[in-house]
């Protein structure tokens, strides 16, 4: 039995997947603008342990982890180095994989990149705003 803390009910509860025998995990990944460090590794090591545990218990686990490969920090690093944001992202994604491989963290099944899903993200934000779950200020969208 796996017990998890439900932040909505503020109670520990027995884990039950939405679909019997299947578990889908989405983990927000790194923003690759610098070399990975222990703080980057912690969530991925944690999810790797959970994923392996669930698989050992017989669940079919699908694990997705994104890369925020376009971001102010990435653009600033690119400007400092005189290269493109994509070169910065690609370099540090490769460094991230190298570090996670050294820690024996299993790779996710899918690694979507923000740069490849921007239209979907914009549509989702518009939907959240239209439904009243987000609002816009002069400089930000608050969700």
Q: What is the meaning of each model-derived region?
A:
Residues 1-142:
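NTP-dependent nucleotidyl-transfer catalytic core
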